[in-house]
Amino acid sequence: MSEAQSELQASLLAKALPYMQRYENKTIVVKYGGHAMGNAELGKAFAADIALLKQSGVNPIVVHGGGPQIGAMLTKMGIESKFEGGLRVTDQKTVEIVEMVLAGSINKEIVALINQTGEWAIGLCGKDGNMVFAEKAHKTIKDPDSNIERVLDLGFVGEVVEVDRTLLDLLAKSEMIPVIAPVAPGRDGATYNINADTFAGAIAGALSATRLLFLTDVPGVLDKQGQLIKELSVAQAHALIADGTISGGMIPKVETCIDAIKAGVQGVVILNGKTAHSVLLEIFTEHGAGTLIVP
């Protein structure tokens, strides 16, 4: 390594030090999904980021999705995907596949990636330690012609109703990094598939996490000129939804951020998971890497 390279590395570490101190012993929940999950190099970079957070004294918790992988497995098993109002209907056969893919193959792949860095990850879902309980989701859709709302029956799609932080508190005191699949039981004995974003928000809220990071396929919230908005308050986010600046699929993402803040999360960040080491850039640099939403 040349002298110039050594000086550059030393400078970068010196700049990162205040942020490492700021987040020491703090909980950061990272929702991992999107393009990064299907890219081997980005997956390794993500695992390295999570490992470095742990090594820096942070308490990282990973929550992951897996929609495309679920769809691929359903096709492979010859099970037709059904949709109501654009939302997947999860019948008994489908929820069994969902649990197999999310809590099985995907979860263990992420655990293995983190373990390869030398850290110690453990794979979980909402069933473990009675961590999360869910109930059947109640979704409605409005007919554009009649303006009449009707209730959608999405089967075993659930909403989080209770989070018990006991297991996560125990893991925070250990060397383990929890990797959690968004599958949870109901008090009725059923198994429910839960939207990974809202699941991550519920976990982060229950832990009063310092940060909740959503890794997406976009840089963050953009203004009407297509430029990244670095920071928004909840009130500003509501205003941008009202005036159409925030639209389409970004609306439910931002609404989930707002719900998480109301639940006790100190700040939520939407950032681009397609950028290698975006987690480290967000946490350990002055300007971050996405859009920070705060109370």
From Swiss-Prot:
Gene3D superfamilies named among the record's database cross-references: Acetylglutamate kinase-like
Site (Transition state stabilizer): K31, K253
GO molecular function: acetylglutamate kinase activity; ATP binding
Keyword Hydrolase included in the entry's annotation: no
Keywords per UniProt: Amino-acid biosynthesis, Arginine biosynthesis, ATP-binding, Cytoplasm, Kinase, Nucleotide-binding, Transferase
InterPro entries: AceGlu_kinase-like_sf, AcgluKinase_fam, ArgB, Asp/Glu/Uridylate_kinase, Glu/AcGlu_kinase, NAGK-C
Family annotation (Pfam families): AA_kinase
Catalytic activity reported: N-acetyl-L-glutamate + ATP = N-acetyl-L-glutamyl 5-phosphate + ADP
Pathway(s) this gene product operates in, as recorded in its UniProt entry: Amino-acid biosynthesis; L-arginine biosynthesis; N(2)-acetyl-L-ornithine from L-glutamate: step 2/4
Family label: Belongs to the acetylglutamate kinase family. ArgB subfamily.
PANTHER family in UniProt: N-ACETYLGLUTAMATE SYNTHASE (PTHR23342), N-ACETYLGLUTAMATE SYNTHASE, MITOCHONDRIAL (PTHR23342:SF0)
Protein name (database record): Acetylglutamate kinase
Native species: Rhizobium rhizogenes (strain K84 / ATCC BAA-868) (Agrobacterium radiobacter)
Lineage: Bacteria, Pseudomonadati, Pseudomonadota, Alphaproteobacteria, Hyphomicrobiales
